[in-house]
């Protein structure tokens, strides 16, 4: 399971708090879709966007996320924001995971641990 927590950081903006939160969440939705593709992350993914009061804003952020993920060839399913403000989604796993792709079988324990490849040491 992958969990993503969105925060404003230092980006507090010059507009109202609600508008700043909305803008940050929209930007985060696009970037999350990009990072999921780049890192080939699959399985269950939970996103904790910054709390938004306006239902239209919440719906738009989920819509932006769905649009950004539509560019991905990997099948995804995005569910509406829950009462706790979480977006749950699934993304089909394709290929091996990050650890498996960047490591070799340990010659001492025969696969019970990992030895990272020389290129990432």
PLM features per residue range, with description:
Residues 1-121:
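Conserved glycine-centered short motifs in functionally critical loops
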């Amino acid at each position: 399971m992958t969990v993503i927590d969105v925060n404003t950081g230092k980006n507090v903006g010059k507009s109202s708090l609600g508008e700043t939160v909305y803008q940050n969440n929209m930007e985060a939705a696009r970037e999350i879709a990009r990072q999921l593709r780049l890192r080939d992350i699959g399985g269950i993914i939970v996103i904790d966007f910054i709390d938004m009061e306006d239902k239209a804003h919440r719906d738009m952020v989920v819509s932006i996320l769905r649009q950004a993920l539509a560019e991905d060839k990997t099948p995804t399913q995005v569910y509406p924001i829950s009462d706790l403000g979480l977006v749950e989604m699934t993304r089909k796993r394709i290929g091996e995971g990050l650890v498996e792709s960047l490591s070799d079988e340990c010659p001492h324990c025969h696969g019970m641990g990992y030895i990272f490849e020389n290129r990432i040491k």
